[in-house]
Amino acid sequence: AMFDPQMLLELVDSGMYLTQCYGMTETCGDGLVNYAQAEPHIRALGRPDGHCEYKLDETGEICIRGGCVMLGYYKDPEATAEIIDAEGWLHTGDLAREDEDGYYYMVGRKKNLIILGSGENVSPEELEQKLSACLAVQECVVKEMGKKIGALVCCSEDRQPEVRAFITELNRTLPLYKRITAVEFSADPLPRNTMGKLLRR
């Protein structure tokens, strides 16, 4: 999960020096490193550390190849083939974009993508981050609701109009296909799995 950029900036302002790292068990922890202490790069995953090769494939998925990448899952060639392609690239499942300075920025998880009937792909995490900027939103999940982009929002009943107004303003900044056109509210915390991650069902 990504850190809140505002929190990172506050830590820097308090005198801390931050180093952010992106990686996974299957790459021995190797990945991207971010030494940035200010905007805009403090919100990035980082840049390649030089130990392996990195690229974004045609879908924007982060791929890693080199000595840091595992040979495969123990006695599970099928699972290995699902994550490592014939050219040796490990597909992380994370979607990102790369800026002109070589920094990678998280967009979302490939498995969470909402694929619309029109062919466009929508990252729910991107919209959740934007929606979370509304102070009335305690937590939220963006998902497909009856062929619409919808949001399930946890907030107090008296602040629901504030959230609706925020979504209206947010939608004006988004392409038509990304706009949130359905919203449901919950006064209770949203359901999570045993790992503490919000459920998208």
What are the roles of these predicted feature ranges?
Residues G66, L71-G72, L95-K178:
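AMP-binding/adenylate-forming catalytic core of the ANL superfamily
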Residues S186-R201:
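Flexible lysine-rich "adenylation lid" loop at the C-terminal edge of ANL adenylation domains
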Residues F3, D158-R159, P191:
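Glycine-/small-residue-rich active-site loops that bind phosphorylated ligands and cofactors
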Residues A1-Y104, K110-L113, L127-E128, Q138, ...:
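Conserved AMP-binding/adenylate-forming
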Residues V142, A182-F185:
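Hydrophobic/anchoring residues in structured secondary elements
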